[in-house]
Swiss-Prot record:
It catalyses: guanosine(527) in 16S rRNA + S-adenosyl-L-methionine = N(7)-methylguanosine(527) in 16S rRNA + S-adenosyl-L-homocysteine. Belongs to the methyltransferase superfamily. RNA methyltransferase RsmG family. It comes from the Bacteria. Keywords: Cytoplasm, Methyltransferase, rRNA processing, S-adenosyl-L-methionine, Transferase. Pfam families: GidB. Its EC number is 2.1.1.170. This is Ribosomal RNA small subunit methyltransferase G. Specifically methylates the N7 position of guanine in position 527 of 16S rRNA. S-adenosyl-L-methionine binds at residues 91, 96, 142-143, 161. One of its GO terms (molecular function) is rRNA (guanine-N7-)-methyltransferase activity. The lineage of its organism: Bacteria, Pseudomonadati, Pseudomonadota, Betaproteobacteria, Burkholderiales.
Length: 230
């Protein structure tokens, strides 16, 4: 029986072209150094995926599209918080979208959070190898994190990509939102049922339909504002 051939692994030059075109389509300006760091991050994900169980995606080209470009798609919208905001990425896993935010927004201070120590170990490795001085890692349940103790302070932006139901996310993380800050959830299809379960004092400020280059799938970004943070 003839074995099915695996598709060839994309070269770094091919990935760089895909990244450059994708970032331009998203309106995200990246320097050569930032593009290099994002490609190095893809290489780290591909290298250590089997050890750390980071993603079901094995192909670097698909990693670039489904992880890097997907994460870059939120940068223009989060940028409204200014050039020096503090962000918390909840349920970060392999560092998404937090590592991408730390690279694309070098003036931001980004904290990655996960409950799995193995994932945190990879996050720390990525921080060291990519030399991201604006990135920090904290392990533990988000609802137990205390500003001024487990994390330096409250956050302008709290974001998640694949963490939990929207209502649960808001309930667990709302104590960490700084005045004027908000919670952002990256979702696939429009999450109307999840929005209907939002807790008291929380409401959708905006729902943005995202278009991710080379990705044929629905993507939405939901911003939730809180009474206590207004």
């Amino acid at each position: 029986m003839q074995q099915r051939r695996r598709p060839p692994i994309a070269s770094r030059e091919t990935l760089q072209a895909l990244l450059s075109e994708g970032a331009q389509a998203l309106g995200v300006a990246l320097s050569d150094a930032q593009r290099g760091a994002l490609l190095d991050y893809v290489a780290l994900l591909a290298k250590w995926n089997a050890v750390y169980n980071l993603t079901a995606i094995r192909d670097p080209r698909q990693m670039l599209i489904q992880h890097i470009l997907d994460s870059l798609s939120i940068v223009p919208h989060l940028g409204a918080h200014g050039a020096a905001a503090a962000a918390l990425d909840v349920g970060s896993g392999g560092g998404l979208p937090g590592v991408v935010l730390a690279i694309a927004l070098p003036g931001w201070r980004v904290t990655l959070n996960d409950i799995v120590h193995k994932k945190s170990a990879f996050q720390n490795q990525a921080k060291a190898e990519l030399k991201l001085g604006n990135l920090s890692v904290v392990t533990g349940r988000v609802e137990t994190l205390r500003p001024g103790a487990d994390v330096p302070a409250k956050f302008d932006v709290i974001v998640s990509r694949a963490f939990a139901d929207l209502a649960d996310f808001v309930t667990l993380a709302r104590h960490l939102v700084a005045p004027g800050g908000s919670i952002w959830a990256m979702k696939g299809v429009r999450p109307d049922e999840e929005i209907g379960r939002l807790p008291d004092g929380a409401r959708v400020k905006q729902m943005i339909r995202l278009t991710v280059p080379s990705l044929d799938a629905e993507r939405h970004l939901i911003e939730v504002e809180l009474d206590e943070a207004i």
